[in-house]
C-alpha cells in the first residue's frame, strides 16, 4: 500500500541558496512523523512546500495519489486536506477567537454560521478555552493563542496536520499545554508532520523521526533507533550538542 503523503526529490531554492536539495519522505495515514535538525536545515521550508505556501523547484509531492505540485492544481483543495500551524500563531488580530476559527470553514467549506460556530465551540471546549470565544488574540497568552491556532486548523477537518515549531515562540511554562493537544490528536489517529526542537517530545510521540541536514534527509527511523543508535556522524554530532545543551 502506498503512503498517504509522498515527497519525492523535492528541491527548493531562494536565489542562490538551495534550502531543499532532493528531499525524499513518506507518511502513512495515522502516522506522526517528526522532523528534527538544526535551524536552517529545511524543516519549515519542507512543510511550507507540502501546504503549497512555497512552490517547489524540483521533484513532486503526492497526497492520496494526487500530484499536488503539478501545474493547475487547486490550492484550496489541497489546503482542505492539509492544515498547517505556524510557530508565530498567525491569528487575525482584528477578529475574535470565534471568528478566527470559523472564517475558513464558512468561506472555503461553505458551512453555515451556526454550524461553523457549533463546531468551533466544541473544539474550544475540548482544549479548555470555551470562555475565550469572544476575546481578541491580544487578550490571550502565547500558549492560548497557539492552542486557538491549532483549533483553527482542525476546524477545516484536515486529513494531515503540519506543525511548524509550534512551541518555539512560547515561554517554557506554556509549552506543556500545547504539547498535550498534540498528544490528544495522536490518540485520535490524526496524521501529523511536526518540525520540532522538542527532542523528548519527538521521542515520545513520533512514529518515525527524520533528521534533516543541509536540505536532505540524512537519517530516518523509529524514535528509539534515531535517539539511541544514530548511524551517521551528522546525527551523532547533532544529538551530542542537544544533550550538552540539556535538551534531551
PLM feature spans:
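C-terminal boundary and immediately downstream tail of ABC-type ATPase nucleotide-binding domains
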Residues: 213, 224-248
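ABC family nucleotide-binding domain
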Residues: 3-7, 11-223
Amino acid at each position: 500500500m502506498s503512503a498517504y503523503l509522498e515527497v519525492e526529490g523535492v528541491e527548493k531554492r531562494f536565489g542562490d541558496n538551495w534550502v531543499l536539495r532532493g528531499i525524499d519522505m513518506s507518511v502513512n495515514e495515522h502516522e506522526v512523523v517528526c522532523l528534527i535538525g538544526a535551524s536552517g536545515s529545511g524543516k519549515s521550508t519542507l512543510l511550507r512546500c507540502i501546504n503549497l505556501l512555497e512552490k517547489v523547484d524540483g521533484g513532486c509531492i503526492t497526497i492520496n495519489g494526487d500530484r499536488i505540485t503539478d501545474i493547475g492544481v487547486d490550492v484550496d483543495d489541497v489546503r482542505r486536506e492539509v492544515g498547517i500551524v505556524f510557530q508565530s500563531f498567525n491569528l487575525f488580530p482584528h477578529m475574535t477567537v470565534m471568528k478566527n476559527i470559523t472564517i475558513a470553514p464558512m468561506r472555503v467549506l461553505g458551512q453555515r454560521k451556526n454550524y461553523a460556530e457549533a463546531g468551533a465551540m466544541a473544539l474550544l471546549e475540548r482544549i479548555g478555552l470555551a470562555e475565550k470565544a469572544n476575546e481578541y488574540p491580544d487578550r490571550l497568552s502565547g500558549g492560548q493563542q497557539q492552542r486557538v491556532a491549532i483549533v483553527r486548523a482542525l476546524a477545516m477537518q484536515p486529513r494531515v496536520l503540519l506543525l511548524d515549531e509550534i512551541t518555539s515562540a512560547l515561554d517554557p511554562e506554556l509549552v506543556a499545554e500545547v504539547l498535550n493537544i498534540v498528544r490528544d490528536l495522536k490518540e485520535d489517529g490524526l496524521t501529523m508532520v511536526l518540525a520540532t526542537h522538542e527532542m523528548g517530545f519527538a521521542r515520545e510521540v513520533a512514529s518515525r523521526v527524520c533528521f534533516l541536514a543541509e536540505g536532505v534527509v540524512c537519517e530516518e527511523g523509529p524514535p528509539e533507533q534515531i535517539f539511541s543508535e544514530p548511524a551517521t556522524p551528522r546525527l551523532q554530532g547533532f544529538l551530542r550538542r542537544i544533550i550538552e545543551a540539556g535538551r534531551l
